[in-house]
Every structure is written in C-alpha cells, then in structure tokens.
C-alpha cells in the first residue's frame, strides 16, 4: 500500500490536500508533518512513496529538507507544492532534488493525475497497491 507524507505548516491547507487525496485514493496511508524536523522523523519512520513538500516551513526550509532526504532516499518522489511559483524557486527545487513542482493554485485534477502517474510508474494500482 502506498504512503503519502504531506509536509505543510498551514494546517488548513494540509488537511484540504489530505482530504482531496483520500477521496481519490482511499486505501492509501497518509501522514502529516508541520515542519522539516517532523518531516525527517516521519520519512525515516514510515518510508513514504510520495512526499508533498512546502518550501516555506518553520525552521529549515523545504528545499533543504528535500536535499537531505534525496541524499538518503534518492528513489523517494518529492513534489514541491508552494505559493512561491517563480522560475527561480522552480529551478532551485529541481537543483535540490525535487521530482515535481506545483503551485498551490494548481487544479485538484492536475494533482490527482500526477499522483496517479507516479503510482503507475512505481507499479502500483490506483489505490496504491502493487499490481498483480
């Protein structure tokens, strides 16, 4: 079963994203983290398949956390999801190891399609289970 970690300091946005994804992928496991330190603990503890990472977080920013995580878990898919949708942020996200970059204004359909695409690439079905 696939696991998704949502790293976002805004509890309302974090919950909204979780609800959106749960509606489409109800058998997946979802975890949340409000800052970089909690994110690192959860990544080590649950080994998620996908991480949604905000850039602006309390303490260490999401780009630095992404770099640390990718050094240890290069196969982990990290999606930067931020309001900072500027070319320099996008470029920095990819330099730090992010796999995808989305604006928080991105349509829910695009987010769901991206998750579905990642699951397919990982050999998982639409519910996050291994395909037979």
Where do the protein language model's features map onto the residues?
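Two-component/phosphorelay signaling modules centered on CheY-like receiver
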Residues: 11-31
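Short amphipathic alpha-helix used as the core "switch/output" element in two-component signaling
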Residues: 41, 63-73
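The feature encodes the CheY-like receiver
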Residues: 58, 86
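Conserved acidic carboxylate
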Residues: 8
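Active-site residues of response regulator receiver
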Residues: 54, 82
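Acidic, metal-coordinating helix/loop segments flanking the phosphotransfer/catalytic sites
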Residues: 32-50
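Acidic catalytic/metal-coordinating carboxylates
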Residues: 35, 61-64
